[in-house]
């Protein structure tokens, strides 16, 4: 695939930024277009530093702007679509989440057909497969097993329907008579440097005597390090453009995890931050069934108040279920078809993430020292 080019949507996000950074190392890549709704000054500076032999073009635009998407896709060989409204708690309106995740994906697929882009990789989520109950056990699941989310919550529903649209679009005829080839990568929880979930957890703990609130004690998950998640996208882009590999990949989805040990989300938070004195809350917490029904009551209150007041519960049944389920996946199919092997070991991922958490702790202490002076 000599002289190829790639558009990355959501390029200012946690995963998108890492994909762009890895793409510039691709020897035969001529141009990367980095599309994001709004880039901060720091993000733009970091992207400008990536200018090597590969041209990096920064594009500001909305995933719901069809004309913007057509311009962004023009002349591209591949699209990696990471842009999404990630909102399991439902803080944004249902329509907003559906528009960004589902309508935006369909508009981008249409733009690919119009602009003759033959390769489309979609960043999906394991939440399209469940878990549908915290009592359900899904252990080392693989693609041949039929797991599908039954939640009506806008985030898992929109991701599920968007993935279906992407896979159904495989084989679409492009405007020039060519063929669109698609695949989807179902990512487990992504951790690593610059993870907003981890950042919020750490900052909240630092304001609470370095105590991390427990909310995921009963889960068993296999999160994926951001560098490995990004690497899977690079391999998918390569493989879909390889005439020998592409036929077995077209229209397929893949679970993407790595060799991070299976553990609860609470244990992961503790492991990554304990070097800096952060520790899990040891106080009593509500039993899981009671917590689940409390979430149901809060959702009911939110529904009843909706005509007069927009009440957003602090947690919901989806979040309680996701954070307290046995829900792990195998990456063997990606290994077989894409040649995927984690680039970064658990030990290295743990060290890099811990060092980054250390910078957050230092920043917090510096701010505290300035206030006390």
Curated annotation (Swiss-Prot):
Main localization, broad class: endoplasmic reticulum
Give the superkingdom in one word.
Eukaryota
Disulfide partners: none
**Entry keyword NADP:** yes
Tissue distribution of the protein: Kidney (at protein level); found only in the cortex, appears to be associated with the proximal tubules; and a minor expression in testis.
> What start and end residues bound the annotated signal peptide?
none
Q: Return the GO cellular component terms, semicolon-separated.
A: endoplasmic reticulum membrane; mitochondrial inner membrane; mitochondrion
SUPFAM superfamilies in alphabetical order: NAD(P)-binding Rossmann-fold domains
Quote the catalytic residue positions.
159 (proton donor)
Q: Which reaction does it catalyse?
A: a 3beta-hydroxysteroid + NADP(+) = a 3-oxosteroid + NADPH + H(+); 5alpha-androstane-3beta,17beta-diol + NADP(+) = 17beta-hydroxy-5alpha-androstan-3-one + NADPH + H(+)
Residues where NADP(+) binds: 10-15, 155, 159
Transmembrane region(s):
288-308
Pathway terms, separated by semicolons? Steroid metabolism
Q: What does this protein do?
A: Catalyzes the conversion of dihydrotestosterone to its inactive form 5alpha-androstanediol, that does not bind androgen receptor/AR. Does not function as an isomerase.
Name it: NADPH-dependent 3-keto-steroid reductase Hsd3b4
């Amino acid at each position: 695939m000599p002289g190829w080019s790639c558009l990355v949507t959501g390029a200012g996000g946690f995963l998108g930024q890492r994909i762009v950074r890895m793409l510039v190392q691709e020897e035969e890549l001529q141009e990367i277009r980095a599309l994001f709704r709004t880039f901060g000054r720091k993000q733009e500076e970091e992207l400008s530093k990536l200018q090597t032999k590969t041209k990096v073009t920064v594009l500001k635009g909305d995933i719901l702007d069809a004309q913007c998407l057509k311009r962004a896709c023009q002349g591209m060989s591949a699209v990696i679509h990471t842009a999404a409204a990630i909102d399991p708690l439902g803080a944004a309106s249902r329509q907003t989440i559906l528009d960004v995740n589902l309508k935006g994906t369909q508009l981008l697929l249409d733009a690919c057909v119009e602009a003759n882009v033959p390769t489309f990789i979609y960043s999906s989520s394991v939440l399209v497969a469940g878990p549908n109950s915290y009592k359900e056990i899904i252990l080392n699941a693989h693609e041949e097993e039929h797991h599908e989310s039954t939640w009506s919550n806008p985030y898992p529903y929109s991701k599920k329907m968007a993935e279906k649209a992407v896979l159904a679009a495989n084989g679409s005829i492009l405007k020039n008579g060519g063929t669109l080839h698609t695949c989807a990568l179902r990512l487990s929880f992504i951790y690593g440097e610059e993870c907003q979930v981890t950042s919020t957890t750490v900052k909240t703990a630092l304001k609470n005597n370095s105590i991390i609130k427990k909310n995921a004690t009963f889960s068993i998950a296999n999160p994926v390090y951001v560098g490995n998640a990004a690497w899977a996208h690079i391999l998918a882009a390569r493989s879909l453009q390889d005439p020998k590999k592409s036929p077995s990949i077209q229209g397929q989805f893949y679970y993407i995890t790595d060799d991070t040990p299976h553990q609860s989300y609470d244990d992961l938070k503790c492991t990554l931050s304990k070097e800096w004195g952060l520790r899990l809350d040891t106080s009593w917490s509500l039993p899981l069934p009671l917590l689940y029904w409390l979430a149901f009551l809060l959702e009911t209150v939110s529904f009843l108040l909706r005509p007069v007041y927009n009440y957003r519960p602090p947690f919901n049944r989806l979040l309680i279920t996701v954070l307290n389920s046995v829900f792990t996946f195998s990456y063997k199919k990606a290994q077989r078809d894409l040649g995927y092997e984690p680039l970064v070991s658990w030990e290295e991922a743990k060290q890099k993430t811990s060092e980054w958490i250390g910078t957050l702790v230092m920043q917090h202490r510096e701010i505290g020292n300035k206030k006390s002076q």
